[in-house]
Amino acid sequence: MQRSIKKVAVLGSGVMGSRIACHFAGIGVEVLLLDMLSPGAEQSKLPKERNKLVDNSLQAAIKSNPSPLYLQKFASSITTGNFTDDMNKIANVDWIIEVVVERLDIKKLIYDQVEQYRKPGTLVSSNTSGIPIHLMAEGRSEDFQKHFCGTHFFNPPRYLRLLEVIPTATTDPAIVDFHMHYGDVFLGKTTVLCKDTPAFIANRVGVFSMMSVLHIMEKLALSIDEIEAITGPLMGRPKSATFRTADVVGIDTLVKVAAGVAANCPNDEAKNIFTLPAWLEKMVANNWLGDKTGQGFRSEEHTSEL
């Protein structure tokens, strides 16, 4: 199949969406980055006001360390907008990547809009961390389902090489082959073909590991520093160890993936490992989600309150 990617639409400008946009811009692809209309800007006619949410997210990504861009000038390849005013522009892109919040109902609402404006043959994929791909494809047009799959990037996408490609039973095999090839040759990824099982491969293993550590921590009354000292380079793992990794990934993402596995794998022999400690749920309730909110595991001032 001869297919080229000249322009990509990224739907959702959070930590992952903004950085995926930067990664594509870094390889010379034009990017349309869309998110919700900025709160309180419903009556404004000024794009600057209506796009404040997405613009602020992109600027935060550009200023982050390590940088998501090879060179700062590549940011000029990213055009921002919002779902209300600019969703029609996805008719002019070659690939639509959905990166909105990890809730199936919200993702389906976004796909309703995508179906209104997407031209036939355009690739569509989800960056979900663990929601079953086939649930997002249900009820969609035949052409949508044929060109739809999961493409799961990892944070930060410029530096983490893994890209999981997750087709459904209705995904055209040629589309799967294209994603595997494009991810390898153009995005610089190690592409891994996954079955559409809860949390796929990396998060099924990684979140199991993290949740196991949390339960052991409770049982043995270990501190965050003790866990970090044990589960980092001492074990042959990155220095981000357990809790710094959780802060980067997003504690809300960790919770949603763990809860999703517990709900969708009732017969899994390790199901109890994915049970959430009460203090972890309290962190999410307090909006202590890691780097994205500026408060997570690595702030002793607040984690001591748990």
What residues fall within each predicted segment?
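N-terminal glycine-rich phosphate-binding loop for ADP-containing cofactors
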Residues: 1-304
